[in-house]
Amino acid sequence: MTEQIQPSETSPKSPEKPNKKHWVRKAVCIGSAVILVPVLGVAGALSFDAGQKSLIQLVDKMLDSFSVEQVEGGLQNGLVLKNVRYQTAGIETHIAQARLQLDFGCLFSREVCLRDFTLNKPTIAINTALLPPSAPDNSKSGSMKRISLPISINAENLVMQDLSVNIDQTSITLGNFKSAVSLNNEKGLTIAPTEINDISVIAKKLSEVKSEPKAEQPNKPVDWAAIEQSLTPAFLGNVSEIILPFDLHIPEISGKNWQYQAVNEKGETLQSVEMSSLIAQADTVDNQLQLQKLAVESSLGNLSSQGKLQLDGDMPLDLTLKSHLEPLKSDGKEILPASDVDLTLSGSLKKSTALSLKTKGVLDAELNGNVQLAQDKMPLNLTLNVAKGQYTFVNTMTPLKINDVTLKLTGDLLNYHAELKGDVAGMNYIPASQVELNADGKLYEVTVNKLGIDSLDGKSEFVGNANWKNGANWDIQADLEKMNIAFFVPVMPATLSGKLHSRGFAGSQGWQVEVPVADLNGMLSAKPISLKGSATLNQNVLLTVPDLQIKYGENYLKASGVLDDHSDFALDINAPNLRGLWSDLKGRVKGRVAISGQITTPNLDLDLTSSNLHLQGFQLAKASIKGHINNASLSSGKLNIKAEQLHYGGNIKLHLLDLDLSGDEQNHKLILKSQGEPVAANLQINGHFDRTLEQWKGTISQVKFETPIGDVKSNQAIAVSYDNKQTQANIASHCWQNTDVELCFPQAFNAGKQGNIPFQFKRVNLDLVNKLIEQNSLKGNLQVQGNVAWFTDKPFQFTANVDGNHLAFSQKLDYRTFKLYIPKLTLNADIQNNNLVLKTDINVHNQGRIVGDIHLNDLAKNRQLGGTLAIERLNLSIANQLLTSGESVNGEVVSKLSFGGNLEKPLLNGDFNIRNIRTKLKSMPVNITDGDIALRFNDNRSTLQGKIKTVDSHLNLTGRANWANIEHWTTELNAQANNFNVDIPSMAKLRFSPNITIKANPKELNLSGTVDIPWARIKIDSLPDTAEPVSEDEVILNGPHKSKEELIKREFAAKTKSGMEIRSDLRINIGKDVSLDAYGLKTNLDGLLSVKQDKGNLGLFGQINLTKGRYASFGQDLLIRKGLISFSGQATQPTLNIEAIRNPETMEDSKITAGVRVIGIADSPEVTIFSEPSKPQDQALSYLLTGRSLESSGEVGSTGSVGAALIGLGISKSGKLVGSIGEVFGIQDLNLGTSGVGDKSKVTVSGNITNRLQIKYGVGLFDGLAEVTLRYRLMPQLYFQSVSSTNQVFDLLYKFEF
């Protein structure tokens, strides 16, 4: 029992260890479950499509900033997400569709396989102002090391389409991106052939917002020591090799259609760059970087490059780059011409890198040299050779030109030595010069060992130094040898030699400019000229001149002294002969000027005289300035200026000028006397100045101005006061009087920052205007009352009331005089509160009245229009005084218009009518018996209706206009008539039916429509007998075209004077009843023509048929059997196809036809003589001229035929002359001609003694028999005729017409 009980006593303690192990084991199990269950759960969920979808939906619910509209598929076969949105502070993202496909089977081979990653229409908007501040990056970047990847990555299909990114005011779009990438330890990073197309970047540049000016911060001095320290270490430092994390393989990256645009707030393009093509190919193998190809084609130019770089060892380098730069333009102007640039880099980066740069274009240059990037301060040795270069920096200046320039630069970044040689010229102020420079320098200083310049027909040499370490310091010496300064001062072509020395400083501590030595001498206009002296300027003493002397021939100027708060400066001049010093300057000047006291209020002593001064258009016979002015406690002094015979140009001639000023502040007087043309003034001013109150008071008296319109005087002394504190003047009431004008200021007025001036023109005789324009056109008087006022806190005010009675205007036009009588005229103008009201009432010749009431509100900004304008029965008969006897114009103008809108967009309402138009003018082809034209205005548009009546026809006019947009106004006018009769004296009578439309806008004037001519009778007198044709080689010297060919080929105006392009498309239909009688041609016409004009080219198209025609040629009367004129472009170059035959009635054999064919271009047609049936040319010509053959040439008849033809050919040109002779003797229609055939031919003279009685006399050419014929018309178709010859015959004739 004991043994059994004993263990029971210890039972509570013995189980402690087993219980602890149990709880530990339990805790481990629970912790593992907490970690592994979610991981395994997520992994399990990602293994199935449903799990993947559930996880995405869970994230969508848990995150407010993330949402997905639709989820399809799974990662293994392709997970598709639609309308994915993500939003955070400053960033909004939207993806229309995303597809992601993974191959989980690749994980077993330690590879991540991304089969597809496609984004469609991703949109990203970023507002940088809302982005949270980024945390500072305190990490230090170490050297790059090779990376060993635990797993490979293979992305087969990476696609992005229609990407849109907006970052503040910059918009970026990407049309298409397609690529594939693989990354592993064996091959590194391989980017498969990649396409990046249709990139567009649009940057909007906002106008700068004016910010409040900030207090200026003192400029911190440049820390040159820090700059030197930063430039001292080698550029490559201790870089022994460049290690890439992995190899890189880029078979090809290509891009097409890339574009960059900078626009303003209105969307207007400020800058545009287009890159049409980009190709890049690169590779790294065995620590060698190879650029196989880089090619860029863009609007800026083309670039191509290739090369290689070893990334270890001495880093050998071999790189070539070639580019062609297109002309660079800004605001349509070329700022950089086209250029070619070739760059070659070779050598090694660790030792010496050689470079070669060649340019061609704006600069034809070659730069060669080497730099040592791995050495401290980067030692360099460069040579630049420029064959030629030219560039225009300022459009108004000549371009800068450099030629044969060589620059050698050796040393390093901190210490350098430069040698320069070359030629330079241009920029208007740089003469052709040869420059040679030898200098040493540092970052902050330069020492010029020698600067030689061969220019201006001489030489100059400079030595010295300049330093800008602490402000600016310089010390320069110059030696000049025979330098001609005519290039800079053409009117002073002096040749100078000598020495100049300048030194000084400028900085925060002050400034000083010192010229310790100035010793120049030379020749000017064959006289010696010299300058010797020294001068100093600084912030304490404005100017110190120990001694300065300038001599020119016998002329000299001497200056010495000090200008500061205690000035003591004297200037002496004695120039008895200034000829040759400056341009055409001549004359004599002598005197002295002394300045003492404080420079701001100096004391002056003046004693200068001159005589016979002449400079260009200025002439002065004699002048003097004498006086003393003391500006101590109380300003006082005396000054006298006199001048005699002062002439300038051909208009200003002052015979005498005398200005005398004397007194002090308390009591002073100014007297001005002058005589001359066109204006001379005489006046006296007495005044008093109170320095304490800063007020001046005085009177202007004895005022008289001699002007082209006569003497102008004041009616009294004028009291004037001025308050300097208030900037205000007060002028007492007074009047200005002239024989034609009297201007009065009826009450005292103020003028200053604000003022109020009432005025009154009591009388304005319009003869004053006649004197000014040197014509006698106006008569009458005007009266004007008004007031003008201006203020500091509101707009100015102005009122004027103009009244005129019995006004007249006359103007000679040729031999006539146009007179216009205006019995009464009133004009009232009022500007109040920035609004203008203009009222007018004009009675015109007691035959009409013009009444206006026009408002223009808000003059400063909107300028709103309002008011009315009425024209009451203005009679057009006013113009009859310009017409000849028997001519007249009648009608009346009636209008009532109202205005609205503003000046930029005016609105007009009302009517404008011209009624009862009647004209009878010799210069017009029609007389108007009644006509009306009515314009109707409705806001920003109008319509036109018109009707023009003649005795037997009428013309209709319609039209419309629109100016809703004043810059793009439109108008249209149509003219239409039916058988409108036109009578052109001594030329033509015709009936035509036009339907023509004219359209116009600011850019184009368009004429179109049709013109039908059903009936016309055109008769043009032939040229006079003595007229000779224009020679083929004649040129017109005073015309715009110089030869016949240019006249034919000339272009008509393509644009109007206002810039509108002229276009026309007009069809002309010539009817069947149109006849022409001109220059021996009698025929009927018909056809269709089209007139077209575009861009200055006037074209005529179509054809005209000649029917029933007769033509006098070769001394014969020819019948037109066939006539066709065709136009296919130039109106002066039609194609002719005309066939004219001899009248069969005059042929010996009526079965034979002889004639002329004219075929070809009018300028050079082919003319042939033909016969039917066909005969030799001599026979055909004989038939054409004589009507018979040449076969019986020995017969008398044949000889008579030839003689008759020759006589006929001669007298065919004399009809006009014979007719003129007949008129002298009272015989109408006297003409000379031939009749008969062969040896029966006669010469006949016929004419009308009265309208009924005709006489004809004929003489045989070969038989000499005379014949007299008298014919009397009893009735229109019945004649009595008597023929007296070898026999006496009486006939009674009746005429039939078929």
UniProtKB/Swiss-Prot annotation:
GO terms for cellular component: plasma membrane; TAM protein secretion complex. GO terms for biological process: protein secretion. Residues 1-27 are cytoplasmic. Its main location: membrane. The chain crosses the membrane at residues 28-48. It holds the Pfam family TamB. Keywords: Cell inner membrane, Cell membrane, Membrane, Signal-anchor, Transmembrane, Transmembrane helix. Residues 49-1298 are periplasmic. It is found in: Cell inner membrane. Belongs to the TamB family. Interacts with TamA to form the translocation and assembly module (TAM). This is Translocation and assembly module subunit TamB.
